[in-house]
Amino acid sequence: MDLKLLDILACPICKGPLQLSEDKTELISKGAGVAYPIRDGIPVMLESEARTLTTDERLDK
């Protein structure tokens, strides 16, 4: 995934910023408490495809 894209993408649920996961497989929205998968280098930013963050993930800075 192109890291420049992170500067312009926003969470479709809360409109907040997104963070790339450490393993680079998800875009994380702390504001909405969800993670969107990245498939073949393309973020899938559909609410139906997002997974809910665990409590530990929400608290992780």
Swiss-Prot record:
Which Gene Ontology cellular component terms are annotated? cytosol
- InterPro entries, sorted: Trm112-like (IPR005651)
User: What residue range is the signal peptide?
Assistant: none
Q: Which domain of life is it from?
A: Bacteria
Q: Which Pfam families match?
A: Trm112p (PF03966)
Write out the similarity annotation.
Belongs to the UPF0434 family.
Output this protein's name: UPF0434 protein Pmen_1615
This protein's species is Ectopseudomonas mendocina (strain ymp)
